[in-house]
Regions:
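Active-site and adjacent substrate-binding regions of carbohydrate-active enzymes
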Residues: 2-650
Length: 650
């Protein structure tokens, strides 16, 4: 396959010259001249990169140009169907393409049913989100899924039908509009590595239709599955050993990376890619402004590899990006890649995913709390926090999933730890098996033979709030609340978009009742998937309560971020504070600069004045978070778990 850029550009120009008249003849008359001219301009600008991706993936097929024309027709048809308000948003976003880098971006995520019951209930809670300062709302999977096992909504049976318990597709579109009118961008998942085995495509495949069987990866015997598995790593070793499931009705082995009821899609088939383009643009037309791409690492498969992070996976995502840029430029793609940190960063670019979760920062914040040291955190962030211009990390403390220790062995060993032993220590610490631990958590997918495990639990419980309340220890409670605010303070002030897991702002504790539900038994992740307690939330303004102390502290952090232009964009310079317990960085934008210092110890810490000067600080600074002047003649003294956001005195 010819991958020479000059040759591909020439072929793209020639191909568009041939295809554009055919597209125009079919669609131009369905809209006005001004709209069509704008669309044609976007198509002309972004077609070369779409062509390069698709030709590299599928150019050796005899029917390549048929599929190329088909994807352009699908994109154009769905652009024509796009609501006028969203086309207006497209135009606005093209004049401000990096809108998501604003310091006013503050994210939140939730399960609709657990937070508000359904879409209508969520509409009634928009005022709460506005009170908190949220401008980005990620709703966990809302699509139609099988009854019973459905991987928490990630086994999608239809991308166009909603879970009926939440509401209809029309209600979701209405919700998206109302959120947008309140300045909140809707974020949804695009579960595009697999469907459920109850999806219509899977049903058609089960009925024997070869066209739909080609949408998935199916094998008549174990020859190829055995060959693939020799170089692969199992994802869920307990629940689903291997990566294939025998389907007796088909008499075939189906590729099922995650669970037996989740069938992996076959992106080697361009017809499948085109169908998924239609599903993606359908979500865009519902009002989705940020699309989370689920399990990006697993999209492509090749023998004698681990079938993760392959170059073709990046090309598939880049092709989706190009299509969105043509037909729905208001929508931005976000990657979910829980893989080695070096691999995570490879998904991040304006041509692929401008946004990406930062699982390494999350894991290392918890590491720093457990060890009381920032050596690993500082080393890893100095090495890998910088990403391409125009892109941003989505930084979070907790989410719907477990905590995996997603940092590199190199960074941990460089900080003086044995990587394997250190992961074991962290798991023991956060599951309460380590003497002196403040945490209340539970292991997830624990392997007794190797000791490998991930950790479940709510932020407040993991940070010590639950234990302190149990022991009625006010001093321990004060430290625990300080931990919660400290790590949220980092995600609010470091480069990128901060993302709250709703419930953490009122210090929601672990829900141990999940194991009484047979459908949840054995999955400790339900420990941190409790229904939002609106009765506790009523105490959020009462500073004598835990809920009030955490909520008001977080609100101050959010307001600090939104009021200071230094937190615009994503650039962050990680500094060395000269103290192994203090994490330091500087944020700058135009004439605005702030220095952020975080004490990850329950002891008082000092930073030498000489080191402060080396980092660019002056003798007298203003702590924007505390709202007071700070003078450091000889040294700066930080109280336990203190966050300082220092600006020069004007």
């Amino acid at each position: 396959m010819n991958t020479d850029k000059h040759w591909l550009d020439e072929q793209a120009t020639l191909s568009l010259k041939r295809l554009l008249p055919r597209i125009a003849a079919r669609f131009e008359g369905q809209t006005d001249a001004v709209e069509w001219a704008a669309y044609r301009d976007r198509l002309t600008r972004h077609f070369p990169r779409l062509f390069a991706c698709l030709h590299t993936l599928y150019g050796d097929r005899y029917d390549f140009f048929y599929h190329l024309e088909s994807v352009l027709c699908a994109a154009t048809e769905l652009w024509l169907a796009r609501p006028g308000e969203l086309k207006g948003l497209d135009a606005m976003r093209e004049t401000d393409p990096q809108w998501y880098l604003s310091n006013r971006m503050v994210g939140a995520m939730c399960y609709v049913d657990l937070f508000a019951g359904d879409f209508e209930g969520l509409r009634q809670r928009i005022s709460y989100l506005a009170e908190l300062g949220i401008t980005y709302l990620h709703l966990m999977p809302v699509f139609k899924v099988p009854a019973g096992d459905n991987d928490g909504g990630y086994a999608v049976s239809s991308y166009r039908e909603m879970n009926p318990e939440l509401g209809s597709a029309d209600q979701l579109a209405e919700l998206a509009t109302e959120l947008r009118h309140h300045g909140i961008s809707l974020v949804l998942d695009f579960v595009f590595n697999h469907t459920s085995d109850e999806h219509d495509w899977a049903r058609q495949a089960l009925s024997g239709d070869p066209e739909y069987q080609a949408y998935y990866r199916m094998y008549p015997d174990r020859t190829l599955p055995d060959a693939f598995e020799r170089s692969m790593t199992e994802v869920f070793t307990e629940d689903h050993p291997g990566a294939f499931t025998y389907v007796s009705r088909l008499k075939k082995w189906v590729w099922t990376t995650f669970h037996t009821y989740q069938w992996d899609l076959n992106y080697e088939n361009p017809a499948l890619f085109n169908r998924m383009v239609e599903e993606m643009l359908g979500l865009a037309n519902m009002g989705v402004e940020i699309l989370r791409l689920d399990a990006v690492a697993f999209l492509w498969k090749r023998l004698n590899t681990d079938c993760q992070n392959l170059p073709e996976a990046h090309l598939v995502i880049q092709a989706f990006n190009a299509v969105a840029s043509i037909a729905a430029p208001a929508m931005v793609l976000k990657s979910e890649a829980i893989v080695h940190p070096d691999e995570v960063s490879r998904y991040i670019s304006q041509a692929e995913c401008p946004l990406s979760y930062n699982p390494q920062l999350m894991a290392l914040l918890w590491d720093a709390l457990a060890t009381r040291e920032v050596r690993a955190l500082q080393r890893a962030m100095q090495r890998s926090f910088t990403i391409p211009e125009g892109c941003a990390w989505v930084n979070y403390v907790r989410c719907h999933d477990d905590i995996g220790w997603a940092f590199s062995d190199e960074d941990i060993s460089g900080a003086g730890f044995d990587a394997r032993e250190h992961r074991t220590f962290l798991t023991r610490f956060y599951t309460g098996r380590f003497a002196g631990s403040f945490a209340r958590g539970a292991p997830f997918q624990e392997n007794p033979a190797t000791g490998d495990a991930r950790v479940s639990g709510n932020c407040a419980s993991l940070a010590g709030v639950e234990q302190a309340l149990e022991q009625q220890d006010e001093s321990a409670l004060e430290l625990a609340i300080a931990r919660v605010l400290l790590i949220h303070g980092v995600i609010m002030t470091i480069g990128g978009i901060p993302l709250l897991y709703l419930g953490d702002e009122i210090a929601t504790l672990n829900d141990y009742s999940y194991d009484q539900d047979p459908a949840k038994l054995g999955d400790s992740r339900w420990l941190h998937r409790a229904a939002f307690d609106w009765q506790r939330c009523e105490r959020r303004r009462d500073m004598s309560t835990v809920e009030g102390r955490v909520f008001q502290g977080l609100l101050r952090l959010i307001q600090l971020r939104r009021q200071n232009l230094a937190f615009t964009r994503a650039e962050t310079e990680i500094l060395d504070a000269g103290n192994p317990h203090v994490f330091a960085y500087v944020r700058s934008h135009d004439q605005h600069t702030v220095f952020v210092l975080s004490n990850f110890s329950e002891r008082e810490q000092r930073v030498e004045a000489r080191r402060l000067r080396q980092m660019g600080m002056r003798k007298t600074m203003v702590d924007l978070y505390a709202g007071r002047s700070v003078t450091a003649t000889q040294e700066l003294v930080m109280v336990p778990y203190q966050l300082m956001v220092l600006a020069r005195v004007a």
